[in-house]
Amino acid sequence: MSEFKKSILLICGLLLHIVSCKNVSNKEDDMNQTSNSDIATEFINAFYSFNKDSLQSTLTYADDSRHSIIYYQKWAECGNYKVIKQNDFIIKNDSLVLCPITVKDDLIGALEVDFNVTDTFHLTIINEKIQSIETSSNDPDLFYEAKDWIKHNKPELTEKACEGTSTACECVKATVEGFIEFKANNTTKF
C-alpha cells in the first residue's frame, strides 16, 4: 500500500472517530433534556392534581421553593384553576426548563375579562432533581389594578385572610370577592 493511501486511510479513520465522539455527546445532551422534560412533566402533573403529597414528592430537593409552591398549589386549587392548554416546555439550557401553562380561574372570571392567564414555572433541575422553582404570569394590568383597589378600599377583605402562610384558600376567595366588588364599583369600561 502506498504512503498516500495509508495517509488517506489514517485521515478517514480519524474523521470517523471524531464524528462518532461528537454524536455520543449530542445523544447525552438529548437524553439529559428528555429527562429534564420528563421531570418537568411529573411536576406539572403533580401540581395540577391538587394533591399536596404528590407535589411534595417532586420538591424533595427544592428547599427554598417548596413552601411557596405548596401554597401556590392550594391557591390554584381554591381559585378553581383549570388547565386550558399545556404549552410546549422550553428547554433553556441543561438545567432550566420553562413550563408555560394556560389556565382559566375565578380571579380573572371575577373581573369579567375574556382572557386566560399563562402561568410559567421556571424549574431548575440538576442531577435529575428539581432544585428550585420560580413562577411568572402574564396577568393583565386590570388584575393588578383590582389588587391595588382592594388594598386601598377594602383592606379588611384580605388583611386577615392573607396574613398567614397556611391560608391560601381563604386568601384567594377573599381576593375573588374583592375583585367582584372592584368590578361593581368601577364604572370604567374594560
Tell where the protein language model's regions lie, with residue ranges.
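Short, low-complexity N-terminal intrinsically disordered segments enriched in polar/charged residues
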Residues: 21-45, 49
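Short, well-ordered alpha-helical segments enriched in acidic and aromatic residues
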Residues: 43-65
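A mature extracytoplasmic/lumenal domain signature
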Residues: 59, 101-105, 136-139
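Surface-exposed, charged secondary-structure patches
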Residues: 73-122
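Low-complexity, intrinsically disordered terminal/linker segments enriched in charged
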Residues: 133-190
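Bacterial Sec-dependent N-terminal signal peptides
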Residues: 1-31
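Mature extracytoplasmic domains of secretory-pathway proteins
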Residues: 112-141
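Sequence contexts marking disulfide-bonded cysteines in secreted/extracellular proteins
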Residues: 20-22, 77-79, 98-100, 161-172
